[in-house]
Amino acid sequence: MSQSVSERTRIKSDRYESGVIPYAKMGYWDAAYTVKDTDVLALFRITPQPGVDPVEAAAAVAGESSTATWTVVWTDLLTACERYRAKAYRVDPVPSATDQYFAFIAYECDLFEEASLSNLTASIIGNVFGFKAISALRLEDMRIPHSYLKTFQGPATGIVVERERLNKYGTPLLGATVKPKLGLSGKNYGRVVYEGLKGGLDFLKDDENINSQPFMRWRERFLNCLEGINRASAATGEVKGSYLNITAATMEEVYKRAEYAKMIGSVIVMIDLVMGYTAIQSIAYWARENDMLLHLHRAGNSTYARQKNHGINFRVICKWMRMSGVDHIHAGTVVGKLEGDPLMIKGFYDILRLTELEVNLPFGIFFEMDWASLRRCMPVASGGIHCGQMHQLIHYLGDDVVLQFGGGTIGHPDGIQAGATANRVALEAMVLARNEGLDYFNQQVGPQILRDAAKTCGPLQTALDLWKDISFNYTSTDTADFAETATANR
């Protein structure tokens, strides 16, 4: 007697039985799995719902971020399902947390389209964050294999070429954000750019939300900025620039503004993270083809990066943006007004600047990773910093960084040019002291170096007097799980 259709399609297998079975039994958990060099690895912080086994929660994340759905489907048998299933292979309790677990998951590289951050993220963070079996989920780190990294462009210009273009070595770069960020006319905006560059800064920049508003259209801003840049460059003999924000409603408009910036002589353009991954990669390709630096403002990142138990750790965003092709990205200051644990910030900077990563748990780096010759990305420190913190900034952040003093330049009592000069003199004094072997980070030595430099620089003395008591000494909400490192200005 012939079998019925349902009988013929019911496969007797541990991993295939019609209906709903646990993810761990479907093949999404494999404690004996051997990680391959070509695997994409992801580390998730999982908070299971009460009563949900952590291993099953990890398997559910692996399944829902790769091939699974809520029930077994017979079409799995038409694929290489054993290969394409993501494998949760390790679950560890999070230190000092009673209900959180680190879940390590491996993905076959063929699950992702080459050179497509949008496709990668559609799987890794696309649907699984709303899964009912978990009450919170955070993507903490990823390892992108060499073979997959090679399909990405990486930074359009990179640190080495940027320094060659600026002819500036062995010191951080100096910048400032034009303030107020909204409301200035084009003429006054250009004046701020000129004064800051003339006073000693390398860059001025637009802020994240200045695009093309009724009080100042983008062409007006671009033209006045370039006039200020050219005048300051002629006066100082240095290569100068201003980050022109080309973020817009459509990619057609983004390209139009980028082409115009190039035509009038700009060396750098700027975009916002809120543009989206496809837009960021698209303009990064344009920047590489047109020999333009590309600055990224991380606008919007704290909506998903700041909370410790849910969202995406910023270190992952750093990896994605380096892959996408930006040259600059805001990555924290340690001592400024924005969130920033010292060790976590150092981890972000290492991800952007090193060619190879080693496991460093206090820095929050969970995977070894070779960057496959992708160029290095310049971190930007911005938000509530001033020249009185120069010894701390150099100690924590090193040389390959843009130090952006917005209020710390434009808020100077003697004017914008004086504020820029104060920052330039403070930086050069501290770099010289460091190069001479002085213990500049010492709380007595560092401030004294600045006071000595201020004896021959009135603007620096004024700045030190004005901001000497200003600090943002708060405990970070996001700290490393393997070290106690509350943010402190010391």
Swiss-Prot record:
Site (Transition state stabilizer) location in chain: 337
Cofactor notes: Binds 1 Mg(2+) ion per subunit.
GO terms for biological process, alphabetical: reductive pentose-phosphate cycle
E.C. number: 4.1.1.39
Catalytic reactions on record: 2 (2R)-3-phosphoglycerate + 2 H(+) = D-ribulose 1,5-bisphosphate + CO2 + H2O; D-ribulose 1,5-bisphosphate + O2 = 2-phosphoglycolate + (2R)-3-phosphoglycerate + 2 H(+)
Function: RuBisCO catalyzes two reactions: the carboxylation of D-ribulose 1,5-bisphosphate, the primary event in carbon dioxide fixation, as well as the oxidative fragmentation of the pentose substrate in the photorespiration process. Both reactions occur simultaneously and in competition at the same active site.
Protein name, per record: Ribulose bisphosphate carboxylase large chain
